[in-house]
Amino acid sequence: MGLFNVTHPAFFLLTGIPGLESSHSWLSGPLCVMYAVALGGNTVILQAVRVEPSLHEPMYYFLSMLSFSDVAISMATLPTVLRTFCLNARNITFDACLIQMFLIHFFSMMESGILLAMSFDRYVAICDPLRYATVLTTEVIAAMGLGAAARSFITLFPLPFLIKRLPICRSNVLSHSYCLHPDMMRLACADISINSIYGLFVLVSTFGMDLFFIFLSYVLILRSVMATASREERLKALNTCVSHILAVLAFYVPMIGVSTVHRFGKHVPCYIHVLMSNVYLFVPPVLNPLIYSAKTKEIRRAIFRMFHHIKI
């Protein structure tokens, strides 16, 4: 018998938010707004970095990578969610579900790697400013971006195969708005310990290590800033980190909450679990362009000039 000659449903049924099905129609309105803001805001930042010479610097190249990742995550999830909420079209084929699962986890891990690269950018800019231009060359920036994507692909490539090896015969109903590895594996009528162990390994070895090194970079940044004599210089240096810190919090705080509920929240209502997952995936792509537009005057100026030229 072949490795993948096991029972799989032809399609899954997505419940959306279990227990809140009657609210799906009015929830679709805010979700449409979030989708538009995520796509529009991040596309504007991508275009601003592309056309504005003053933004051709490492910090903004990393920001454009973050915006690309946010657009990709939004496009991988929100159309399915809106189709479920607006049209009550809940079915998704087994293979499409696998692809969506891979893309969600891939771009989430890629975003974590980009946030780590951005923390390194802030570390070099503040702790070793004289070498900033020589350390973060265009080649190094491109290599860091490709490295984040390659790490995500290599680490997550086994996930679809780990699901395909499992016989799924309990149900074809996914109590979620989209397809994720933990929810799919729980439908299996076989031992899922390998999937659970690999999922925990991925969580700790990538997201956990990224967060550790981001924290370490800010410890070193804070130590360097505190050694600066001038209070004005300290505030100026720390102000350059505010946008990145907010982006890190917007990404990791919901992720830690979701991961904790996934593994330890057996008595947490299902709708709370799904709502937290939606916040984790939908909110950062909406907040990131707003954070950087509000806190970074160079971005605001570039966007203003870009729209001014379009108007003319």
Curated annotation (Swiss-Prot):
* One Pfam family hit: 7tm_4
Q: Does the keyword Transmembrane helix apply?
A: yes
Q: Where in the cell is it found?
A: Cell membrane
Query: What Gene Ontology molecular-function terms does this entry list?
Result: G protein-coupled receptor activity; olfactory receptor activity
**Can you list the GO cellular component terms from the UniProt entry?**
membrane; plasma membrane
| Record Gene3D superfamilies | Rhodopsin 7-helix transmembrane proteins
Disulphide-bonded residues:
C97-C189
Please provide the Gene Ontology terms (biological process) for this protein: sensory perception of smell
Membrane-side (Cytoplasmic) residue stretches: 47-54, 121-139, 218-237, 295-312
The stretches that face the Extracellular side, renumbered to this chain, are: 1-25, 76-99, 161-196, 259-273
Transmembrane stretches in the record are: 26-46, 55-75, 100-120, 140-160, 197-217, 238-258, 274-294
The annotated topology with respect to the bilayer is:
Multi-pass membrane protein
The positions flagged as glycosylation sites are N5
Keywords for this entry? Answer: Cell membrane, Disulfide bond, G-protein coupled receptor, Glycoprotein, Membrane, Olfaction, Receptor, Sensory transduction, Transducer, Transmembrane, Transmembrane helix
Q: Which CDD domains match?
A: 7tmA_OR51-like
Q: Which family does it belong to?
A: Belongs to the G-protein coupled receptor 1 family.
- What is the annotated role of this protein in its UniProt record? Odorant receptor.
The name this protein carries in UniProt is Olfactory receptor 51I2
Species: Homo sapiens (Human)
Which lineage ranks, top first, belong to the organism behind this chain?
Eukaryota, Metazoa, Chordata, Craniata, Vertebrata
